[in-house]
Amino acid sequence: MAVPGSLAECGYIRTVLGQQILGHLDSSSLALPSEARLRLAGSSGRGDPAARSQRIQEQVQQTLARRGRSSAVSGNLHRTSSVPEYVYKLHVVENDFVGRQSPVTRDYDMLKAGMTATYGSRWGRAAAQYSSQKSVEERSWRQPLRRLEISPDSSPERAHYGHSEYQYAWRSHVVPGGRLTLPRYARSEILGLRQAGTARRPPGCGSFSDAVFDNGPLKPTMPTHPPGTSHSAGSLLEETTVRVSQARLQSTQSRTARSSWPRSSVRSSLREPGRMLTTAGQAAVGSGDAHGDRSVFADAQLGNADIEMTLERAVNMLDADHVPVSKISAAATFIQHESFQKSEARKRVNQLRGIPKLLQLLKLQNEDVQRAACGALRNLVFEDNDNKLEVAELNGVPRLLQVLKQTRDLETKKQITGLLWNLSSSDKLKHLMITEALLTLTESVIIPFSGWPEGDYPKANGLLDFDIFYNVTGCLRNMSSAGPDGRKMMRRCDGLIDSLVHYVRGTIADYQPDDKATENCVCILHNLSYQLEAELPEKYSQSIYMQNRNIQTNSNKSIGCFGSRSRKLKEQYQDLQMPEERSNPHGIEWLWHSIVIRMYLSLIAKSTRNYTQEASLGALQNLTAGGGPIPTLVARMVVQKENGLQHTRKMLHVGDPSVKKTAVSLLRNLSRNLSLQNEIAKETLPDLVSIIPDTVPSTDLLIETTASACYTLNNLMQNSYQNARDLLNTGGLQKIMTISIGEGYAPNKASKAASVLLYSLWAHTELHHAYKKAQFKKTDFVNSRTAKAYHSLKD
């Protein structure tokens, strides 16, 4: 049963875990026997105080022994922190963005001593700060007892983001204010009076294809997507290449450099004494000659002689006869090192036919060789589409998956999953990845690490850790953009959606909404909710939409001059009895379930990661697009049951323009429900007016946001005289008229939307006197420009 939390936990509720969890604690042996039993035992000669003390010590020792065995065998009580392991390593530094270097300053020993540790989230545009006053052991053994089941009452204070510049693996564009932003992964189109056209992309963002993450050039023709849906269209990017230190070149027995691989071109390396770390941007401005920078390293097995290693020599050593395994590993490590910072080196290795040789090394039952080969391949395919295709054509994906299932070396698994992430960024390989890798990745990584279906919490064990799970979710995030067929296959994958939902709910319950793997999971769910109505399997559509087919379309009553857009038909749709929810949803049923709706609203309120917020808003936007039972059910749930408007309206005032645009798009979909319009207007009208600029918007993103705001206001004004009067009283009409005029003879979407709104406002004859009193005249509302815009939407 849910019970309110303490004042310190405002916005959350707690639920009691099931009895089966308590069964694992097994601490009842700490209780002493009753005095009666002690006296009875005394008759056997063991009732003296010394015997009693001995029994207590024996019981304590037995309990500690059981706990020790439990920790070694079972991970049921273990929970991973969202802070990756490499953060605690003092000698590992992560440089994520050029222009901002914030090496980790706290290590594992400091955490054990109870000192505060902070780290950058390395994923969004801000660096979220985390701290801990407990030891790592305490946090890893603490069993969380809270589950967030409703959207919190209020959102936390939003972090303030400063000016920073980012460098990415692909083109970026500059927004007003000089801030460099990466192209968004998500694109949204809004449900209007008729299908909206395809939005223009910012320069350098690629094409609006049905692939979620495309980084190719703009295509001559762009497909039109169903209006009202949120569609991902940017590139998720690839995993970063791994830089190998000089010490690694000298000893192939050392571990590969640990790193996290976020969506930007992040490079991680081992800290070298007295040497600055090299980031992707620094490498880019350095030497690009694959042969000019030659590394000299000592190999003990070559008699400690200094050998000048080149790419040619390294590639030749990969398959030479009678070459010791240690030299093969060293050669692969050298290739990994060289291809880290030089795109020319990646191309040169391909020309030397090094990729087939590296793939052949996967057959060797040697962890060092496999690890080095996978690391080299991961760097070779980074930002190199030809190398990606080469790996795929050589049947590399099945080989990698085979090693992933067989090896017990965590570092090798990290290299493989990082390599698969890079491969999945290629549009040409996404379907191949879904066909060959989806099932294995789900069964081998996603399900076991998430803790589903046992109901356990996300945990690491001897075979998996957070970085591996994070890499796989990044790979699946790319794969979820593979178009309709790919989405359908992923929805049908048994256990995938269940595990993703279970993991996200677990991080929310642990007060970790900014977990970077959570962002990946939510983006996958967002993509899988795209076009959900149209792509539902037949068994669901037959049961859920049967009532839709039985609408009285043969009624003699007129349904209005605009067909399916008329008010009467909308009322018939919305008067339908909503389909009942299953108490135990499975698979695709999670996508529209009330638990997931609350999960999205919780992330909107609690997360400070822009992409997590945008994906959550976009998923709700997808689910509310359309006129069937599911969109209507979700809209009512968001507005009436879960108090979702308060969280959505706050997103209208965030600094990130894409989050703001997606929030307006969601409100536009919600405003199409007649029964919700007055409530939406009461809650959000001042906010919608406030985000409309005073002048004609000039950027594509601001144009889209302004157009969505005007269309939302139009939905709210059409059927309500009071809402139209409230709009007049806000003082926003002058801004709307300014935007309606636009830029002469080339009106954009925003000016067209403003014109439609003005034309609709004049239809309220009761307000004509109020308009004139406010110094407005009829021609401000009805003229050739507004009439043309209004009637063009009705055609």
Swiss-Prot record:
Residues 258-268 have a biased composition (Low complexity). Its main location: nucleus. This is Plakophilin-2. Residues 1-318 are annotated as: Required for binding to single-stranded DNA. The gene is Pkp2. Disruption phenotype: Knockout mice die during embryogenesis. Embryos show accumulation of blood in the pericardial and peritoneal cavities, and absence in the head, dorsal trunk and yolk sac at 10.75 dpc followed by a significant decrease in viable embryos at 11.5 dpc. Embryonic heart formation is abnormal showing reduced trabeculation in the heart ventricles and thinning of the atria walls. Loss of DSP and DSG2 localization at cell-cell junctions in cardiomyocytes, DSP localizes to granular aggregates in the cytoplasm which are surrounded by disordered swirls of intermediate filaments. It is found in: Nucleus; Cell junction, Desmosome; Cell junction; Cytoplasm. It comes from Mus musculus (Mouse). One of its GO terms (cellular component) is intercalated disc. It comes from the Eukaryota. Residues 197-233, 245-274 are annotated as: Disordered.
